[in-house]
């Protein structure tokens, strides 16, 4: 009787999970969902004929992942590999796996990425959120495994940061995520509202999202040209929240944003959505205080109400009212995680900013306001950077690290001033919006 009861309960649980997975796609237009999938394929990674495509997705997002698979084959992909994960299983791994297993990343998994990279694969990552899932899990164990994986996949991540590999990150909602964002709504209403917000923020809610993104990309070009021609020696950020930060820039730095172009000359959009224009600061020339204005989700844990103090580029002090241990673990990942690899300008006039809703997801929240990136700098943010060695990049002032984690600090009253070499100051942003 016990075994039979267990099987019945298991079947009920499985049925409930299936109903949940199916149910969340009944609350969004199927036509719009297909357009969203096509956007990831055609604009996100710009799949080429006979190209290998890897779709990385949690099993909960199987319906949308399959739509991407179909769109990729329609675009001419030679093969579409579904690389499934399961967050519930990942939690069990962190809770119960042996310590020596936590401290290493399997060779066979690293070998897969090398094989895919060598084959010229494009990677599409479908993400979602369940902020409470990893409660009770040791942040130290999670950090150990994440560090091990980044170390083994260092070459892969270097190729993604230099855009030698085309990749795209986009999101779909979950019931757990939706009720966190909209706690006052019913589960179904919350999910429907989050679908609407995600598609709106991703500019995927119109009749022709691909055309909308082509227009969106053109809007970046004039601002990038002005910033790149100006070659400001430093940027000065101030806000009423307490931020007073000087960010020194390396010589011959480049601002990029919107789309990027890989070494073959093929354009793509790594982030859907994207509203940022970003560059790499000089590793040793960041000074002052940065006060975060949005929670940071790192390794499944929440870091909130926190600040960072910089001296000569290095984080010398920090505090988080929530997630202090996680913040410490992040900063102590390696020597490079004490320094910055990215500085990004974002207007508060973007669709996501105007929605004025905290999504508890870095991909979306970083596109609502200015942010920094702790850790590794992209070679693409330096003239001829993709052709420089790691040593040459460091000599030019760029930071190297196993990670890159973005922290949002922009506000509605943020002021950004560009400082030229001779000391001339130029107002770049006022009240959180561009002035050029």
Range-by-range predicted roles:
Residues 391-436:
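Extended hydrophobic packing segments that form well-structured cores
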